[in-house]
Amino acid sequence: MLNQELELSLNMAFARAREHRHEFMTVEHLLLALLSNPSAREALEACSVDLVALRQELEAFIEQTTPVLPASEEERDTQPTLSFQRVLQRAVFHVQSSGRNEVTGANVLVAIFSEQESQAAYLLRKHEVSRLDVVNFISHGTRKDEPTQSSDPGSQPNSEEQAGGEERMENFTTNLNQLARVGGIDPLIGREKELERAIQVLCRRRKNNPLLVGESGVGKTAIAEGLAWRIVQGDVPEVMADCTIYSLDIGSLLAGTKYRGDFEKRFKALLKQLEQDTNSILFIDEIHTIIGAGAASGGQVDAANLIKPLLSSGKIRVIGSTTYQEFSNIFEKDRALARRFQKIDITEPSIEETVQIINGLKPKYEAHHDVRYTAKAVRAAVELAVKYINDRHLPDKAIDVIDEAGARARLMPVSKRKKTVNVADIESVVARIARIPEKSVSQSDRDTLKNLGDRLKMLVFGQDKAIEALTEAIKMARAGLGHEHKPVGSFLFAGPTGVGKTEVTVQLSKALGIELLRFDMSEYMERHTVSRLIGAPPGYVGFDQGGLLTDAVIKHPHAVLLLDEIEKAHPDVFNILLQVMDNGTLTDNNGRKADFRNVVLVMTTNAGVRETERKSIGLIHQDNSTDAMEEIKKIFTPEFRNRLDNIIWFDHLSTDVIHQVVDKFIVELQVQLDQKGVSLEVSQEARNWLAEKGYDRAMGARPMARVIQDNLKKPLANELLFGSLVDGGQVTVALDKEKNELTYGFQSAQKHKAEAAH
């Protein structure tokens, strides 16, 4: 329980008491022994105690007040007093309650303060040491402010004080120079102009504090770390050669500051140490966090206000980094703090600069993942990251792609593991990160695309022209021949109701295996409802919820987007869609960009249908499709129509197509009945009757669904629930020509099996 140093100190105290024939072992004996204990001695030094004076006072008190054993009683030994025993017990209890295993000399020193009536506690108070000072040092390494300079003008801080300052730096900062020496920092590639400006600012006489401002991921922290790396390598001007960069850990600085003034004391001591070491530079990452850090509720004294006086005088040098958003929203509002820094804009590097950066970092990643990156793979990582990963910036997102490609290669089974990462591997990683199809079309995808048109024509009848336009646009995009900054395709499907405009898009999403994002435009007829697509502006209800359209595309960037019955929407919706069709992006109310470059945009409309249904004059049927297109031109503005890839007119369904529709509905019904164990047979006469009954040129295929429901599904429902088809069976549907109605033959599963056996 007691550590070895404390046991040695206690043994020395008993030996001293026996040597002087003292009758009792007192708390003063204990404190005198602790002056030689490393742990207790360090705590007392941190509290600025004059150890020599304290030792003299203790020795004098012990000699004057402690009873001495008579020479005649040689057998009697020195006995510890009750107060001595209580001090050790309290130290043990205190350590146990804090979850530690060993009692140190510093813990015993804390316990001495509980013996208020003892001379030892009095002498500690006399030297301006409180129990809280010792506890703070044990828990957090907090030292009392060092006393003013000694009356002796030639006195210099001793080595112990210097060691205390170094320890304080180690507790609350990270030495980036030391980290660079052991290989913990990647080398800085490029950024010569920014680094040169930062060094110039650091060498100024006053206000020598550079502030690196840029978007997240552009390499602000890398510049500060790279400066430390170059100092270690000796690749800096002479005036910077002896500098050491410390990175501030604001979390450690705040941790454990329970009482008012703890944080200020700790931070002031750190600043004083930096001020004394003229070659030290403090790097504060996310420097906007110091505004308000350590401030009590309602108080104005925070880390920013504590550091301001030293910043303008040039006594300490600070490098800060923050983003444009935090700089304008938080940092710049404290004008007094902002003027003490020299803003340096860190812009996003170009593609060529990023390639150079990754080539410089490549050996580190190759050694870590045990792979090799080809030159084409590095360039592909940068170019694809720029093209498809829009929520981050170079070089960070390109480095992420390289790193993840190496990790993916490393995690492959040994039999499939490759030693080289090529362009195809990079494409696969980018496709997973951005949730888009791979640039290189696989064999399975190639088969899907080849048979896409035929598959859609088997599911949607009579609209071959529309299907061909859709599939050709998708094939061009997957072949890499589409517009780089536009959606895969932007189509307006026009035509009468019930002919398959919506069904084509539904079947397209199923065939490609991608998400269908469907928006019914009848919900956006009012002007104020348009904001729901991109999010409400600040001050309005729903501002924090984002936009329905932008959120859906951000979540599913590779999808089929269906805007159903677009003519019912407010005209402002058309204006929102202009930039989507032209530039492939849409910004929501929070500034997030939704990427539509891998979206198939389909809009449906019934505009112009009324013109096609006008009665013809005379015996010849007139083609009114030209009038229908004129109606579409009236509703949709020229700039809207000009951005569409195609306006596809869906024709009325012919009688031949209706027979195919009947067959499709019967197949769908059979699939439902298969789950019940029921087989369905419909004669050709019955199919012809259903086609004749359900055909309506103006209404399309929707009346057919109602005819199937009334004439097939309703009679089957009662038999499935209460009749002969409860346990399965067979249904035969035929036509009674005399009555001109359908007849139904139901056969239970058991009877069907018996007849089959005979």
UniProtKB/Swiss-Prot annotation:
Keywords: ATP-binding, Chaperone, Nucleotide-binding, Repeat. Belongs to the ClpA/ClpB family. Component of the ClpAP complex composed of six ClpA subunits assembled into a hexameric ring in the presence of ATP, and fourteen ClpP subunits arranged in two heptameric rings. Binds to ClpS. Residues 169-417 are annotated as: I. Residues 140-167 are annotated as: Disordered. ATP-dependent specificity component of the ClpAP protease. It directs the protease to specific substrates. It has unfoldase activity. The primary function of the ClpA-ClpP complex appears to be the degradation of unfolded or abnormal proteins. It comes from the Bacteria. ATP binds at residues 214-221, 495-502. GO terms for cellular component: cytoplasm; cytosol; endopeptidase Clp complex. This is ATP-dependent Clp protease ATP-binding subunit ClpA. Residues 148-161 have a biased composition (Polar residues). The lineage of its organism: Bacteria, Pseudomonadati, Pseudomonadota, Gammaproteobacteria, Enterobacterales. CDD domains: AAA, RecA-like_ClpB_Hsp104-like. Residues 1-145 form the Clp R domain. GO terms for molecular function: ATP binding; ATP hydrolysis activity; ATP-dependent peptidase activity. InterPro entries: AAA+_ATPase, ATPase_AAA_core, Clp_ATPase_C, Clp_N_dom_sf, Clp_R_dom, ClpA, ClpA/B, ClpA/B_CS1. Residues 80-145 are annotated as: Repeat 2.
